[in-house]
């Protein structure tokens, strides 16, 4: 043999064992004689190495990769020693064996990995043990497949492998045929339900499903399970068809198909259990929704009934307000006539006095209307105090349209009067006309009294609530009117006092009027309080002689001081006769003794008791401050006594550690 042929044969054998290069499969290798000794071959290799070192060839892009000289020295003798038995066989046979070993082993590993990943993608927790056991079985079957493949291999050419793949595609095994049938059965069941193959396959699947679907009564779950099963069988058939193209052995494919069928059965079981568990849950949810819907319907019906009841209550309150406003409609007609005479009344003060008298007469009628409105309010306040008060106000506004027109005219008259005279004359005329128009809005007045007339008007409300009090006040008011008529002719020049009289009738008017009048009323009340204290000073001296007890004296004096503040007309009665004033005051004070008094009076009583002096009105709160100075030394005396006393033991919250020495000294 020539040297290049021997080198080529050795190099090709070396490449097959080391790198598994496919480039040199095309070269036809001829058998060489085994009679060549190793020493001659080694000499020839050395000569070749010398030539490669001295005359290096330029590396061509398409040329074969050459071995290093050190690798050639080491590997060639070893190869000859190992494969003495294999060299007896023809070269193409053992090359095919080596190639088959290398190319078949990774394909089987890939099949196992793909199937393992597809088998349990949905049950990592429940079927983990089964998956591990099946992997162990697959490993055993892989080793068996390798042994079978070694036995079945025979003498063939190198280029027969792609031919086998084509044959496997053209004439597949029974397992691949079954997978194709399952695919055809799907398409035929959807398109051609009359085909025999689809009927046979569907009957088999239905039988398997009926065995496991004894507990499930509804057919919807079976239809879903068949669909899912058909999808799983499709995936299994696809995976198996891929393995057919890669594997040449039919035995391994049959084993994999059997495993896939067993897994599909388990998958059906799991699907049915899952569907049954899910089918129970929505029924509960639907029941809850139905219950909620019924409850919401019942609540809506109840809310509608409650709304109807509220509307009925508001209608009743409106009817009660109508009755109250009927008495005020007659007065609203008189108020229009009074408005026409506004401009003429500015010049003549005698007409003002007559209108004040008429307004006082009308105020007596308005108080009767107040009583009726309060009775209707007590029933309405139980449900909603604020809402019913607003509704009563709205109902009175809607029904007394004439009174609203009267208000607008009165506002216009006020603006004209402010331009002409911004002083007290404008206030008199506005208050006298507003008193007449204000009678038609008793519901508004009563609803807004408690909010803005806090402490001053509580006593009036309590007095009006009782019938006996109202009668006693009615007698007192009649005496007031008689005294007022006599004094109006004497005091026409005084402009402040008629304003005070007109304010008595307009104390319970609307809010925007009361805000303007408050500032003037405070100044007038201070003046009246001073005069009342002068008269009360004389009364207190007489009462101190008659009554020895201080408690009764303070109660009567405080009640009288309140009346002097709220009712400035009382000072005039005192000037006339002390006996009549004391009798009228006692009648009003007796029912009020049982009623709670404001907090300011109680604190003032305590100060008065300590001082021991007579009654002091709230306008003179500053003078009682100096007597508080003798009270100061009493705590100083106590402090001196505390200094003389020994120090108290330490409190438990400030107690230090028990190891401290000063604690033992104190103890």
Swiss-Prot record:
Main subcellular location of this protein, as a coarse class: cytoplasm
GO cellular component: acrosomal matrix; cytoskeletal calyx; sperm head
Function: Plays a role in the establishment of normal sperm morphology during spermatogenesis and is required for acrosome attachment to the nuclear envelope.
GO molecular function annotations of the record: structural constituent of cytoskeleton
Chain intervals with Polar residues compositional bias: 238-251
TM segment ranges: none
Biased composition (Pro residues): 624-633
Chain's gene name: CYLC1
Pfam families, A to Z: Cylicin_N (PF15241)
Subcellular location: Cytoplasm, Cytoskeleton, Perinuclear theca, Calyx; Cytoplasm, Cytoskeleton, Perinuclear theca
Renumbered residue ranges of the record's region Disordered: 121-251, 275-634
Summary of the tissues where the protein is detected: Testis.
Sequence repeat spans: 287-305, 306-337, 338-368, 369-405, 406-442, 443-475, 476-516, 517-547, 548-569
Record-linked InterPro entries: CYLC, Cylicin_N
UniProt keywords, alphabetically: Cytoplasm, Cytoskeleton, Developmental protein, Differentiation, Repeat, Spermatogenesis
Renumbered residue ranges of the record's region 9 X approximate tandem repeats: 287-569
Bias (Basic and acidic residues) ranges: 129-172, 187-197, 284-326, 345-371, 380-394, 417-431, 438-464, 483-506, 521-533, 549-558, 583-593
Gene Ontology biological process terms in this record: acrosome assembly; spermatogenesis
Summary of subunit composition and partner proteins: Interacts with proteins of spermatozoa head including ACTL7A, CCIN, FAM209A and SPACA1; the interactions may be necessary for proper acrosome attachment to the nuclear envelope.
Origin species: Bos taurus (Bovine)
Domain of life: Eukaryota
Protein's recorded name: Cylicin-1
Compositionally skewed regions (Low complexity) per UniProt: 173-182, 223-237
């Amino acid at each position: 043999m020539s040297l290049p042929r021997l080198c080529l044969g050795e190099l090709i054998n070396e490449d097959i064992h080391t790198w598994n290069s496919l480039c040199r499969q095309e070269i036809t290798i001829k058998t060489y004689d085994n009679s060549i000794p190793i020493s001659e071959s080694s000499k020839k290799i050395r000569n070749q190495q010398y030539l490669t070192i001295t005359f290096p060839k330029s590396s061509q892009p398409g040329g074969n990769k050459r071995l290093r000289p050190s690798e050639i020295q080491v590997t060639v003798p070893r190869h000859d020693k190992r494969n003495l038995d294999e060299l007896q066989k023809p070269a193409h046979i053992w090359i095919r064996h080596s190639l088959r070993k290398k190319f078949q082993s990774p394909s089987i590993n890939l099949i196992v990995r793909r199937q393992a990943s597809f088998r349990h993608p949905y049950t990592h927790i429940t079927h983990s043990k089964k998956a591990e056991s099946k992997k162990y079985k697959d490993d055993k079957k892989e080793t068996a497949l390798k042994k079978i493949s070694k036995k079945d291999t025979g003498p063939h050419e190198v280029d027969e492998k792609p031919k086998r793949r084509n044959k496997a595609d053209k004439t597949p095994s029974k397992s691949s045929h079954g997978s194709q049938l399952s695919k055809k059965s799907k398409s035929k069941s959807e398109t051609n339900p009359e085909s025999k193959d689809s009927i046979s396959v569907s009957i088999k699947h239905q039988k398997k499903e009926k065995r496991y679907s004894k507990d499930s009564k509804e057919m919807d779950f079976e239809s879903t399970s068949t669909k899912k099963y058909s999808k799983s069988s499709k995936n299994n058939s696809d995976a198996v068809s891929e393995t057919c193209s890669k594997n040449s052995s039919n035995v391994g494919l049959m084993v994999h198909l059997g495993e896939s069928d067993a897994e599909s059965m388990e998958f059906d079981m799991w699907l049915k259990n899952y569907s049954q568990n899910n089918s129970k849950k929505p029924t509960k949810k639907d029941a809850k929704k139905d219950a909620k819907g019924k409850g919401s319907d019942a609540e809506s019906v109840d809310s509608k009934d409650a709304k109807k009841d509220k509307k009925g209550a508001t209608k009743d309150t409106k009817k009660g307000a109508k009755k109250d406003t009927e008495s005020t409609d007659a007065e609203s007609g008189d108020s229009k006539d009074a408005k026409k005479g506004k401009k003429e009344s500015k010049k003549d003060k005698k007409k003002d006095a007559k209108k004040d008298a008429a307004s006082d007469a009308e105020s007596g009628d308005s108080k009767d209307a107040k009583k009726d409105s309060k009775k209707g309010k007590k029933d309405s306040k139980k449900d909603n105090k604020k809402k019913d008060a607003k509704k009563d106000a709205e109902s009175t506004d809607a029904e007394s349209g004439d009174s609203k027109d009267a208000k607008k005219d009165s506002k216009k008259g006020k603006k004209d009067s402010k331009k002409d005279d911004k002083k007290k004359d404008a206030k008199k005329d506005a208050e006298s006309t507003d008193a007449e128009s204000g009678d038609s809005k008793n519901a508004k007045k009563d609803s807004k009294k408690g909010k803005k007339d806090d402490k001053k008007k509580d006593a009036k409300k309590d007095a009006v609530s009782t019938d006996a009090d109202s009668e006693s006040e009615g007698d007192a008011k009649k005496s007031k009117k008689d005294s007022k008529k006599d004094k109006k002719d004497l005091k026409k020049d005084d402009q402040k006092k008629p304003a005070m009289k007109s304010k008595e009738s307009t104390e319970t008017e609307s809010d925007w009027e009361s805000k303007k009048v408050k500032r003037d009323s405070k100044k007038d009340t201070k003046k009246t309080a001073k005069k009342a204290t002068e008269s009360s000073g004389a009364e207190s001296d007489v009462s101190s002689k008659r009554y020895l007890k201080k408690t009764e004296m303070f109660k009567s004096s405080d009640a009288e001081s309140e009346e002097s503040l709220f009712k400035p007309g009382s000072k005039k009665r005192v000037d006339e006769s002390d006996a009549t004033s004391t009798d009228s005051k006692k009648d009003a004070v007796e029912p009020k003794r049982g009623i709670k008094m404001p907090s300011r009076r109680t604190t003032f009583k305590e100060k008065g008791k300590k001082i021991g002096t007579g009654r002091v009105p709230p306008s003179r709160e500053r003078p009682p401050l100096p007597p508080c100075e003798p009270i100061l030394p009493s705590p100083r005396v106590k402090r001196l006594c505390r200094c003389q006393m020994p120090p108290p033991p330490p409190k438990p919250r400030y107690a230090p550690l028990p190891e401290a020495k000063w604690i033992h000294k104190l103890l």
